[in-house]
Amino acid sequence: NYSNPQKGLPLLHSSVQVFDASKGNMVATLDGESVTAIRTGAVSGLATGMLAKKDAKVGAVFGTGVQAKSQVEAILAARNLEKILVFSRTKKSAELFCNVIYDTFSIKASIGDKDSLKEADVICTATPSKKPLFAHGDLSMGVHINAIGSFKPYMQEIPVETIINSKVIVDKIESCKVEAGDLIIPIKEGKWSFDMVHGELGQVILGEVSGRDSDGEITLFKSVGNAIQDLALANIIMKKMNNDRS
């Protein structure tokens, strides 16, 4: 329900059920929103570490929900940022989120605008938007973008021009072909193709494809989520729970 965030509720309600592989019985039910936020943030942090400029100083986040907070945590873990710019549909939600960022991470946070977006070295988009959140001309060269909000073919956070002019890395190419509106829409307009994807994040990590080649190129990580990430996180949680009990 798209009105849920205004009510202080998650956009989507979900749960993750964990089963014992040897016995077949359910051993835990995890909050799906928390699992999604943690694993999505972790992957964005990894992508930022592999693709953002080493001297990145300014981060920007579009959105003020649980996912946005995990994105901020992730990029702060990956780079020594000095401030975060917050972009939201309302001034009130942006101000509140700036306070959350400062109180949680002890880093300066301020409301962003079109002009200040050019300062950003790392941008995270975490919204259910159906139209681009910014214009390509608002970006600086060398920026890295984590686009994680759109997960349906009709959703779009990133301008077509930005997709065309970026080195695009994805979490899973087959999933993006079905769900990544940020990539599907440019294809429908005849301006891009999946053959132009530089590679998957795993390939960058393994050294099979290059990451950032220069401080001047724009890199974009598109993630729609991957079930193996949920499994990996659930496994970590269960191991920690079992260790805490012993």
Regions found by a protein language model. Give the residues of each.
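Phosphate/diphosphate ligand-binding glycine-rich loop within oxidoreductases
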Residues: 1-56
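Short helix-loop-beta connector
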Residues: 51-58, 80, 140-141
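Glycine-rich Rossmann-fold phosphate-binding loop(s) that bind the pyrophosphate
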Residues: 64-65
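Short acidic low-complexity segments
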Residues: 105-120, 135-136
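Alpha-helix C-terminal capping/helix-to-coil transition sites in glycosyltransferase folds
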Residues: 116-119, 140-141, 164-165
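Rossmann-fold NAD(P) dinucleotide-binding segment
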Residues: 122, 129-144, 157-160
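Adenosine-phosphate binding glycine-rich loop
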Residues: 156-245
